[in-house]
């Protein structure tokens, strides 16, 4: 008599990518409401997809938690894999689009303010001349968020900055060095060093910049008094020009915007290291490679020299 081996009900189903996208959004955002908003679904639709995914896998993926729901361990396991699956599918779609031809492809870029105002316009202009049909998607965000978008397959290239004391990026992220961007001390007077401003009110930037500022000041023997925080360099320069505080700024930001009344003095040895980051094994898709080449050219065109007039 033949032996019949019980088969779990999950074996009868193929995971639905649309439902995996719902699970991924719920895992990242933490609520049905937020997931529905991101995916442009109604809340009942999100709940339906989660329920169907449970029925198809035979696993409890979510459980009640107060007035809401949260992932179970099984749900978290599948959500982690869902992010990888979605990233691969989106990457495959982007590669196929690029393979059809750069004349009708699309490449997606995420980066931060100072690069958007300096390198990106030059790179996009050059790319447009070489490949006029290639579309560019642009997202304005800080390095940690840009890398998250990159690893989830939502973008093709992330331009990030690092300091010497920044923790290493994940192993599966490939970094392409673009340039080293000097840091400048901003004040509305003649301030030449961090130590000379130990008693000043400081304006801090993003988390990565704030940590580096604290580290630099600690090396000079003081802890800065931070009175304001902003990731917008226009806002930071406005506060400095009004005499409300002092700050540091990368040179690229000063190339993009330099408010009248601000004195910028280069900090010896202080730099942001600027990289274009890609994800996965080489080679990069043609559209991604074309963007990397354009970014390298733009970086070379702004490297060297000072973005500001140095004080006498």
Predicted regions and their residues:
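Hydrophobic hinge/microswitch elements
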Residues: 141-155, 161, 208-263
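Short helix-boundary/capping micro-motifs
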Residues: 25-43
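Central regulatory/effector-binding core of bacterial HTH transcription factors
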Residues: 104-166
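Flexible hinge/capping segments at coil-to-helix
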Residues: 170-205
